[in-house]
């Protein structure tokens, strides 16, 4: 369970309003697939993932990144109940997709990297700390249904 102060919640939601979520999602998922190439096995049906350029320009990667980040954004509306917010996605990734839950942590790290780049000086150490708590909480919630 993630424990955010009211100030951290306000910081996260305030900064989130400044980002282009679709671009963050596409960049974060693309980076995950490039930096951790073994994660590509879940996306082999996306076509050409043969190079960093191919991954980052792949329309299916961008579309799925958008889908992922919109789920993440929905979770930001439920910071006090992330397990509930991500329950069905946890079940899907566990029972049907068989995704290693460690990958959720890796994707969270990619989200933080992209946010740091996009937000620049607004992504203060306090903001990084708050977002780190959030992505850790989301990763934990997504891993919740694993046996």
From Swiss-Prot:
N6-acetyllysine: residues bearing it: 83, 145
Transmembrane parts of this sequence: none
GO biological process, one term: hydrogen peroxide catabolic process
UniProt KW keywords: Acetylation, Heme, Iron, Metal-binding, Oxygen transport, Phosphoprotein, S-nitrosylation, Transport
UniProt GO cellular component terms: blood microparticle; haptoglobin-hemoglobin complex; hemoglobin complex
Span of domain Globin: 3-147
Modified residues (S-nitrosocysteine): 94
One Pfam family linked to the record: Globin
Extent of the signal sequence: none
CDD domains in the record: Hb-beta-like
Residues that coordinate or bind heme b: 64, 93
Single annotated GO MF: hemoglobin alpha binding
Entry keyword annotation includes Transport: yes
N-acetylvaline: modified positions: 2
Family: Belongs to the globin family.
Assembly with partners or alone: Heterotetramer of two alpha chains and two beta chains.
Entry function: Involved in oxygen transport from the lung to the various peripheral tissues.
Protein name as catalogued: Hemoglobin subunit beta
Organism: Mesocricetus auratus
């Amino acid at each position: 369970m993630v424990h955010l102060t009211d100030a951290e919640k306000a910081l996260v939601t305030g900064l989130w309003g400044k980002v282009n979520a679709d671009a963050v999602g596409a960049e974060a998922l693309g980076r995950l697939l490039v930096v951790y190439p073994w994660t590509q096995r879940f996306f082999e049906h996306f076509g050409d993932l043969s190079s960093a350029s191919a991954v980052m320009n792949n329309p299916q990667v961008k579309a799925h990144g958008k889908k992922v980040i919109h789920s993440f954004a929905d979770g930001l509306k439920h910071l006090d109940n992330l397990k509930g917010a991500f329950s069905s996605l946890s079940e899907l990734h566990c029972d049907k997709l068989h995704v290693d839950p460690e990958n959720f942590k890796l994707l969270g790290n990619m989200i933080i990297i992209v946010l740091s780049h996009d937000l620049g000086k607004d992504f203060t150490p306090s903001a990084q700390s708050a977002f780190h708590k959030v992505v850790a909480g989301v990763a934990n919630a997504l891993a919740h249904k694993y046996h």
